[in-house]
Structures are given as C-alpha cells and as structure tokens.
C-alpha cells in the first residue's frame, strides 16, 4: 500500500470466491487400496448430478481385481412445504477364493434404505411417512466397502411405512394403514405386518341432534365403532420377498362397537348402562383335540385354514 506516494509494508488480503446456488455436476474420484481376500480395488468412484432443483442423484461403484464389484445409487429429494426424503440402494457381488479351488464362493448381498417425512402444514387431514431399512441379513457383516464399517455390529433392521387420513364431517373417521418389518440379522428371522389397518368412528348420539341437549335414557345413548385388521408374516432371510413367505401368513380383523347411556334415577342417583359387541374374522383357526385320559397324552392342535368368525358380548351397569 502506498501512502502519500510512499510505499509501506502494509498489504490487504484479496481473494475471489465464486458463489453459486446451483449444485455442481461431476465425477467423484474413487479411493484406491488393497484387500487381502479380493486384491486391489477402487471404491466409491462415480458420478453426481442434479436433474432438477427438487432432487439429486449419486451413482457409485466398487471393483476388485478378483472380480467382485458393487453398485450404489443414492438420492435426496425435497419439495418445500410438502415433503423431504432420501433413498439408498446398495448391491454387492462378492467372490471369495479362487475359481476351481476349495473355499470358492459367490454371494450377492443388498440393502435398501428409504426415509420420507411430510411437512405437517402441507395437508392437515392426511399424513404419509416412511423409515425403511431392509436387505440381506449378512450385508453389513460381509460388505467390504469402507462406508459400511460403522454398521458392522448392527443386529437388527427395522422398517415402518404409514399413512393416516381424517375424514371430516359428522361423524368423523380416522383411518390409518401401516406396514412394518423387523429383521434379526443374527438369526436371519423376519417378522412383518403387511399391513395393519385401523379405523375409528367418533362417538355418535343417534337419538339427538349433533348439538342438541342430551337428557334422559334415550337421548344419552351413544356408540362408537372401531376396526383393526392385521396380516402377520414370519419368514426367514432366504425366503424374504419370495412368494413362499406368504404360505404361513396369519391374518384377521376385529370389529368393536361399544354402546352406553346414563340417566338420573329418583333425582339423586346416576345410573350408567353399557355394553360391547365384538366380532372377529380369522383366516385360520386352531382346533384342540380332546385329552387322551387312557394314555395321558395331551390332545394335538390342528390348524384349520379358511375363513371363520365368532362373536363376543359383555354388559355392565352401575349406580352412584
């Protein structure tokens, strides 16, 4: 800097930093290394691009000199004031040993992750959310990609996808539909609920107007209705997402209608009367055979497939 044409040792730092609001498209440089079982490798190399302002895509790949390879596709999306989420698809083809020698094996493993959340203000009457983590039970244990190392000790995979909606009016109806998944990566057992359906109708007074005065035994009669249906599946990792996993599905539905009323008796006593009706629909039932008294053998249980139904009733009353 010159002051009055006299040079001084003082200087001002200067730099140019271009700022952009757009995401840059380009190649992702891979990491290079060596694995004792699969030779030299390149990992996590690929390409990134953003087709629009609402989502982007990352494509990555791995390759090992023994022939093993892996692919990953990841995407993040967001629509302002509506929803946001991410999706990850991972696949690896792993080769162990050398072809023609003992110990040679070839294995495909995969993992799927999806998260989705809805802005609470986008639609107050309906909501959709998802948190999915499913795939091969041995994915995180056998994957040789460095990105999966933190999940090596993960023993469970859980997923849940739900949708709920409220139908306004009188009576209002709340409806929810949920699919869930729980997977033990050690025992390779998979438990699912595909789906669980719930519906609830608000309390109604059939013998009085909506905002009318409720007096007497008749006008105080009120009832509700609720429904719950579920389809449960227990299977193994080897049968997951195959048609055989539906062979032992257990499904059913329960209808419930509570009914009650209250009134004054002798001006000072309050009387409450109520009851409940339930009907259960089942896709299969269990028949218990009689106990064998002579041989002292407990009767066997037979599973009978096919639709069946039964009812339950109860009644209650109180004075206070």
Give short role names for the model-derived ranges.
Residues 1-320:
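Outer-membrane beta-barrel proteins and related beta-barrel translocases across Gram-negative bacteria
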